[in-house]
Structure formats: C-alpha cells, structure tokens
Design a protein with these regions (language model features):
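Structured soluble/peripheral alpha/beta segments that form catalytic or ligand/cofactor-binding pockets
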Residues: 1-293
Length: 293
C-alpha cells in the first residue's frame, strides 16, 4: 500500500489517500485466500477520505485485475490513478463514495522535499516492511466534486507485506506531525508474537533521520466505536478532531508536544483484533464495495 496524508495550512481540511494492491482490509480478498493463495492484483483499490470543515467523504471501491494497470511510475485502478514524474506524485481521483453514493473527483499533487532510502522491518519474520518515502511534502488539493481547494503539509509512505496484517499484529498506533525543522513520526505496534514495534524519529527537509527517546504514553478518550487511542507526548495531549471513526479503525488530529515543541499530529489507531471479528467483517462491504470493472 502507498499512503498519502495531508492537513491544510489553516487546519480546517485534511485528506488521506491509500493505494492498495491486495487490499489488507478487503473482505473479498480474505474470502479468496481461504481457498489458498489469491492474486493480490485482483483486489486493488484507491481509498480516498476527504475531511472538510463541515463534511466528510469516503470512497474505497475494490476492482479486479482487468481494471488495474501499472508501470514503473504509474498505478491505475479503474478511473483513478497515481503517477510519479520524478518530482511530484499526482493522484487523479474519479470515485463514488460509500455508503451514500456521491461523486468524488479531482486532483491531488504531493511534492516531497526529498525521497528517503531506508525501509524498516516491522516483525521478526521480515514479511512486513514500512518505508517513509517522503516524510516532508507540500500537498495541493484541487477537487471538483466536492468543490474544494487548499494546500498544506503532507507526507507519503509505503507498507509492504506478504502475510495478512491481522496475523502479525493485534494493535497499531501511528502518528506524524510537522515540526519547525521537518517532521516527527511515531510508529508503535503490538505483534502477535508478543514483541513490539517502537519507532520514534525525526526527519529534516533533506531527509536526514534522527531517532529520539519517545516521551510518556498517554491514553486518550476512546472513539464512538470504542477504539482505543494512545499517543506519546511530553505534556497532556488532546484530541482536536476525530476524522474517522470505524469499527476497527480511527483517524484523528491530536495536539501534543514532542522535543519541546508543540505539534499537530495526524494519528491513526488500528485494532486488528476487532478487524477480524466476524461481525466487523460482515460490515465491510457497505464501506468497501467491489466493482466488476
């Protein structure tokens, strides 16, 4: 998966885009794997979540391999695609939202200050990796439907794995925020083998990384779906806005303090124990429909 996150300079808008090859959250892919190995290209989607001041829109339509094409610098799923020109990542979106069908169309452009080279292995078996491709980027959003234009601070990364996410991890907490000198990222996960992922790092605009000792862990108020949220901060953090509240997943903006500096974090919480519950699996098609082409 490739993930793009951004917040507008005025703090009123946000966007998340995730390009999936073999969607880790797909109920159709999970069903196909019950009978043996399944082709990940037959389960692709471009997930778009738009967080405007007074509204939200979500689209995540899965499509078969016949609707997918990719090259060394582009990835197309149905009517939407991502392309890289050597300087910027451009995402052209033409999707239908769910569960209420509305058109979501427009262009997003992410311009990184630098591309990093280091990926991180997240478990002992080595079948899950994370690469913070562009810790610092400027993002321009130009949506036609809904009509929305803004620019702001952003980021993109990549997760790669050859095993189901829920088989390797039970809980996942990730956050990233812009700092005066670049960006700070916190990545924590509880593995099924009892081990932990604990990453705390900063990046400057030239891509130079430094690790730091993460501050104390704070437990935040649970979401409406009772998803737990935890974040590290040098003083008491606060939830500014719950952007996404789903049965197994939450995305929030959080005010915190890292390295003696106040930061606004884009934060995600993922409960994989909750995700694999049968009742949750039965809900997924309502937000993640599958198209025939």
């Amino acid at each position: 998966t490739e993930n793009i996150d951004a917040l507008s300079d005025d703090g009123k808008n946000g966007i998340t885009i995730i390009a999936f090859i073999g969607s880790v959250f797909s109920p159709y892919y999970a069903l196909a794997r019950r009978n043996g190995p399944a082709d990940p290209l037959n389960h692709c989607a471009i997930n778009v979540a738009v967080y405007a001041k007074d509204s939200k829109r979500w689209a995540m339509t899965e499509r078969p391999s016949s609707a997918v094409s990719r090259t060394s610098n582009s990835f197309t799923v149905g009517p939407s695609n991502l392309s890289w020109d050597g300087k910027a990542l451009t995402i052209r979106i033409d999707e239908i939202t769910a569960p209420i069908p509305r058109r979501l169309r427009g262009t997003i452009r992410a311009v990184p200050t630098v591309i990093t080279q280091q990926a991180f292995t997240l478990n002992e078996s080595g079948n899950h990796q994370w690469w913070p491709i562009a810790p610092c980027a400027r993002v321009q959003v130009a949506l036609v439907l809904p009509h929305l234009r803004w620019q702001g601070d952003g980021y993109f990364d990549m997760n790669r794995g050859d095993a189901p996410l829920e088989s390797g991890f039970s809980d996942w907490q990730w956050s990233r925020g812009a700092t005066r000198d670049g960006a700070a990222i916190l990545y924590e996960a509880l593995r099924r083998d009892g081990g932990r992922v604990d990453l705390a790092m900063t990046f400057d605009p030239r891509g130079r990384m430094q690790t730091f000792e993460p501050p104390v862990l704070h437990t935040l108020k649970r979401t409406g779906w009772r998803i737990g949220r935890e974040v590290r901060s040098e003083d008491a953090p606060s939830v500014l806005r719950t952007l996404e509240d789903a049965p197994f997943y939450a995305r929030s903006t959080i005010s915190a303090k890292l390295l003696d500096e106040p930061v606004i974090l884009m934060h995600e919480s993922l409960s994989l124990d909750r995700f694999r519950m049968p009742i949750v699996q039965s809900m997924l098609p309502f937000r993640m429909p599958r198209a025939r082409r």
